[in-house]
């Protein structure tokens, strides 16, 4: 009897502790942080569907809600370092733009040599040269995962991109990618000073040559708030582009 009482004195005080532990919520491991580099590369596939390809880009500029100008370009891109842009609108006929690595030039009819330009310079409306000719973000920016939140009704990963090469168009980008497939949804663009200058919505996608690619992008001026430009992409398809197309000294081609 003495032995039983002794056991009870030891065991009974532990009973409430056992119930308390059982009532605690189950512990779960913290979710793994998404791989920002992998997400950025996946997102680039929606804008650059093939290693070597051609796409037409129509840009319509709006001022105070009214259509102002319209421009047409043919963009030929090979890898992440070479882009050739042919200006197709009648009043710009004969103009061309070339990107090689971190350098860009524009050729204007009547001039003897190409003029060096920067990706950030205005092409038309709210579109910069780099918005058309430099769209491989994984090559130009270092990404960091920031958070997960909803944008345009979809769960999105938010990445912060910081320029890692001098040819990058912007110093910093906040980039919203849809959780299931890393499809771009929204972006905010910042200068080196930290100034927020432009935003973008990735509005429509379509199947082209067997790939889901970007069809419509809208760029908004975040300084004046009175203008925006709509970029519509069509005919995107893989092409075996010759290296001579990207030769800066070839004035017949450039």
Question: What residue ranges belong to the model's regions?
Answer:
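Extended lipid/amphipathic-ligand handling interfaces
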Residues: 43, 73-77, 202-207
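N-terminal secretory signal peptides that target proteins for export/translocation
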Residues: 1-8
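Flexible, processing/modification-adjacent segments and terminal tails
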Residues: 30-52, 58-59, 67-69, 93, ...
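Ribonuclease/tRNase effector modules and their secretory precursors
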Residues: 56, 75, 87, 91, ...
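N-terminal, post-signal-peptide region of Sec/Tat-exported proteins
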Residues: 54-84, 88-90
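Bacterial N-terminal signal peptides
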Residues: 10-23
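Gly/Pro-enriched, hydrophobic low-complexity segments
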Residues: 136, 154-249
């Amino acid at each position: 009897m003495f032995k039983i009482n002794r056991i009870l004195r030891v065991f009974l005080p532990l009973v409430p502790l056992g119930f308390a532990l059982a009532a605690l919520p189950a512990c779960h491991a913290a979710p793994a942080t998404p791989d920002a580099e992998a997400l950025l590369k996946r997102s680039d596939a929606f804008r650059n569907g093939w290693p070597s390809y051609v796409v037409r880009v129509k840009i319509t500029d709006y001022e105070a809600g009214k259509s102002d100008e319209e421009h047409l370009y043919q963009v030929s891109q090979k890898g992440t370092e070479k882009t050739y842009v042919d200006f197709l609108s009648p009043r710009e006929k004969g103009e061309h733009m070339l990107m090689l690595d971190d350098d860009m030039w524009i050729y204007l009819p009547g001039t003897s040599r190409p003029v060096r330009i920067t990706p950030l310079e205005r092409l038309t409306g709210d579109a910069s040269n780099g918005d058309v000719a430099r769209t491989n973000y994984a090559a130009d920016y270092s990404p960091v995962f920031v958070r997960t939140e909803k944008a345009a009704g979809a769960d999105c990963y938010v990445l912060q991109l910081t320029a890692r090469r001098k040819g990058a168009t912007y110093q910093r980008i906040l980039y919203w990618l849809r959780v299931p497939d890393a499809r771009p949804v929204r972006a905010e663009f910042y200068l080196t000073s930290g100034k927020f200058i432009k935003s973008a919505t990735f509005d429509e996608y379509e199947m082209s040559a067997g790939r889901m690619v970007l069809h419509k992008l809208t760029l908004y001026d975040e300084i004046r708030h009175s203008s925006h430009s709509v970029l519509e992409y069509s005919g995107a398809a893989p092409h075996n582009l010759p290296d001579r197309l990207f030769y800066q000294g070839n004035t017949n081609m450039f």
